């Protein structure tokens, strides 16, 4: 069993960290665990989680966020080298409206391929359709005022 703080009984990722739920482990250190996603968007899609439970991006302590992000970078490099990926997406979903389904902070490391046989992920928006400058500036003001 792996040690973890803040574990919840109903969190599948806490179970994976504790060793009570099976997974295909890729890498582990004192703070993080990386394992294969069971519903992959591409060949080699995996998840990186902090061992300490945090619900989402708004909840995670800065030290766990930094460690998880650095582990994801290391995994992304290995995916490109080891799997021959052409690129990688790093994804976090925070909250139900953002498609979060497991409420334990995690980063998806999704290797991307030019070969559609290895990659079923599609962007949920159309790039190349920028908003008007006034709308962008207004959103910047609203977010900045909330900092």
What are these regions (language model features)?
Residues 1-147:
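HIT superfamily nucleotide-processing domains
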């Amino acid at each position: 069993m792996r040690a973890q703080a803040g574990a919840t009984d109903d969190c599948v990722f806490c179970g994976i960290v504790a060793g009570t739920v099976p997974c295909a482990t890729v890498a582990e250190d004192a703070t993080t665990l990386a394992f294969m996603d069971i519903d992959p968007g591409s060949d080699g899609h995996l998840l990186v989680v902090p061992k300490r439970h945090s619900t989402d991006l708004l909840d995670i302590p800065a030290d766990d966020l930094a460690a998880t992000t650095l582990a994801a970078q290391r995994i992304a490099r290995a995916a490109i080298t080891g799997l021959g990926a052409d690129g990688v997406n790093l994804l976090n979903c925070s909250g139900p409206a953002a498609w979060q389904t497991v409420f334990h902070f995690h980063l998806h490391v999704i290797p991307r391929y030019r070969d559609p046989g290895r990659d079923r992920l599609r962007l949920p928006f159309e790039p190349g359709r920028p908003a008007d400058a006034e709308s962008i500036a207004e959103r910047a003001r609203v977010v900045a005022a909330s900092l």
